[in-house]
Amino acid sequence: MPHRSCRLTALITAFLLAGCASQPHAPQPQAPQHLPDGLRADVAVLETTDLHSNILSYDYYKQKADPTLGFEHTVTLIRKARGEFTNSLLFDAGDTIQGSVLADYQAQVQKIDCGQELAIYKVMDAIGYDGGTIGNHEFNYGLPFLSQVTSTPMNVDGVGAQRCAGPHYPLVLANVNSVRDGQPIFKPWTIIERKFAAFTPDGSQLSVPLKIAIIGFTPPPIMQWDKQNLEGKVTVTGVVEAAQKYMPEIEAQHPDLVIAILHGGMNTAPYTSDMENGGWYLAGVPGIDVLLLGHEHTDFPGPRFATMQDVDDQRGFVRGVPAVMGGFFGKDLGVIRLALVRQQNRWTIDKSKTFSQVWPICPPVMVGGKPTIAASNCVPADPQVQLVVGKVQQAAIDYVNTPIGQSTVRMSSYFADEGDMSALAPVNAAQIDYAQQELSSAHPELAKVPVVASAAAFRTGFGGPDDYTDVMPGPLTLRSAADLYFYPNTLTAVKIDGAGLKAWLEKSAERFNRIDPNVSGEQLLINEKYAGFNFDQIQGGVTYTIDVSKPAGQRIEKLSFRGKHITPSQTFVVVTNNYRASGGGHFPGLDGNNVVLAAPDGTREILARWLQAHPTLGTKDLPSASWHFARLKTRGTVVFTAASDKQTVAEADGLHNIRQLRDNGDGTAVYAIDLSH
């Protein structure tokens, strides 16, 4: 494993000393020593996941502090755990380097050089990690960048062999291999050695060595999601197959503990080698003692998994294996309280005394009988984190405040699920404009084929009442473009027929629950199991209605193009992003084989240039809304949740059938939508 070093500066000496002191150097391998049966050691296995480079508690889009997220608060919990537990380990389950303005700034704007360490890794090194794995979003910036910032030479086309500055803890990844030689691009597993305090049955304390094996996995669908970065360079295997391949090697080293770090969640559907969330099956691989999860942006233990087979949602076990998933954006710390006991000359887990927890940085308080997140109840940020990254953070903020124009319209996603397309219209307009120019030269045979565009609102409240796009009338900056288009996707266009277009929209309409008009009570409009970023809305002359009284797959009606019914054989070019075009979201007919344009430019950059070309943006520059709900008279009320006190926003965009019913007291409210209008 890489040697852990503490590079101190005068500014952050105390911080780094505190971080490194809490995690000892790995001891040199020693001859096996006899330890008495009955010896006990309690170890806290701590986990962060899906930090997405949210280091500081700051909302880049609203330009204000947000104490409900940020690694600087998680650090406070890590220090608390290390104070509470004599023995601890700290791991990260991936999606670490991408997902914030700061991350994009260091990767794409003021790209760090080989000798610089990425800001998120600087802070993680300062606190002291024992290991981690690679998430799917680590691949978004390409393999050369990933190789550089992780200090991992890869035998992959287009990637240099130079070793650059990277994290001081081992990164392991077992299921991504180089096409050149078939070997893993990261170490698939490694052994770390630590000395822990243990206690004999009579209460005497001993210092005992433990060998801990860690093995890492990423979601196999990365080959679809980042096809342009990975195709022809790497291959991916299923998480179970990779574990089965390397477990014999690991067991040959006789580790005391095997920890699987999966950037993935859990799914009990029949296993396939390309399963995105294979944690339930990974827990069944013999030899894995502990399972660390991620990717799903939720908590385990947590109510989402309460009905899952062979899952203990109270104590945090998956098929008998202690497991944890620690949220996202630094909102939580995963904690497994692992009770080890020495029996028959080996360490075993005392499952009766082992359990998992998720520690939130903002413990909920009860408001009106409902648990509510209150900023006043959040743990304080560790003040030293700001000292480590404050300079580059300010540079990123200054950059995204670069002016690019003016707008006379409000563009928001508060009611994007209900028909407000104001935040999607500029994205779709920019996509159509770019694609038409490129296709005219690259594919003149498509000159008469209509070009339309698809976009989804990326921020629709999943992360809380502030997790919405809201670009107010007035000056536009690069921050506005980042707010309108959150992810670093590239523009891609596909050629499909009318039947494929309808199937695309039918898949999108799974965002809604089926509404029974005869039910007299409240019915929820939104299907929360279907991600908002998969609710694609198509503009550019296409119009349609969505009948939510119909079953999924039969909801799209009156599908037309420029007033004429779309036939199944009619041809279209749909402009979207690389994620969707390559199969992301499992849309029918989208698997990367019908791509007619794979642009080198990022959608966000295309949008920013389009906004600059329209220095005073108005409604005349934007495509009109393309869909609405089919009229449906219901006996009861159809409801949904959004940010509170936004009814005037809906009305300003022409949605006069929406009214706020009740305030939840946590920044959100329940709204009613009258589908009969």
Predicted segments — roles?
Residues 1-10:
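Bacterial N-terminal signal peptides that target proteins for export
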Residues 21-357, 429-430, 434, 586, ...:
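Acidic, metal/ion-coordinating pockets
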Residues 378-381, 497:
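Mature, solvent-exposed C-terminal subdomains and processed small-chain segments of exported/organellar
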Residues 32, 36-44, 54, 62-69, ...:
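Feature captures C-terminal
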Residues 236-242, 357-378, 595-610:
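Short, cationic low-complexity segments
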Residues 399-420:
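Glycine-rich phosphate/diphosphate-binding loops and the adjacent beta-loop-alpha structural elements
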Residues 17-19:
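C-terminal motif of bacterial Sec signal peptides marking the signal peptidase cleavage site
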Residues 218, 351-368, 560-563:
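Short, solvent-exposed aromatic-acidic interface loops
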